Amino acid sequence: MAKNKTNKIEKKPIKITETILRDAHQSLIATRMTTEQMLPIVEKMDKVGYHSVECWGGATFDASLRFLKEDPWERLRKFRDGFKNTKLQMLFRGQNILGYRPYGDDVVEYFVQKSIANGIDIIRIFDCLNDLRNLQTAVKASNKEKGHAQVALSYTLGDAYTMDYWVDMAKRVEDMGANSICIKDMAG
């Protein structure tokens, strides 16, 4: 915790990110909710006071195209129109972007640029193996585009994952240029 000039601990507000528009239907029904099924709740969610809503990225892009026959960019723009007071966040698979294989730096940079231009404020960037090399390009591109680069460290258990490991990872992520750090516990 940070201390001010009088040596008192400064309290910072807790900021809450709601992930239901991405993670809930990704986890429960294979990302099959259409944009039109989600839009009716957007105005109410916008009034709650969330810091951000994670509504894009992960499997949503692929499912929109392949199974729902929707334009994922149009979905993002509709969310941006509906969330007037809430930041929009996406889940970004590092060098894999939103896909299932690594892409070149130029593709990562372009995708980040287009995501921010179409309404994303915060890009939550992760690599499932915590290989920080796979995060660097997306962090740098997010910062270049004036987006918020949030690095999510993938939490796991095991003898190698000591408190020193997590502290070291956080320091390296900070040095990389991340605007914030998140612990992503995918196993729950």
Question: Which positions does each model-derived feature cover?
Answer:
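Alpha/beta enzyme core
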Residues: 11-16, 30-60, 65-87, 96-188
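Acidic, glycine/proline-rich low-complexity segments that act as flexible tails and inter-domain linkers
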Residues: 22-26, 31
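Basic/polar N-terminal segments that are highly enriched at the extreme N-terminus
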Residues: 1-12
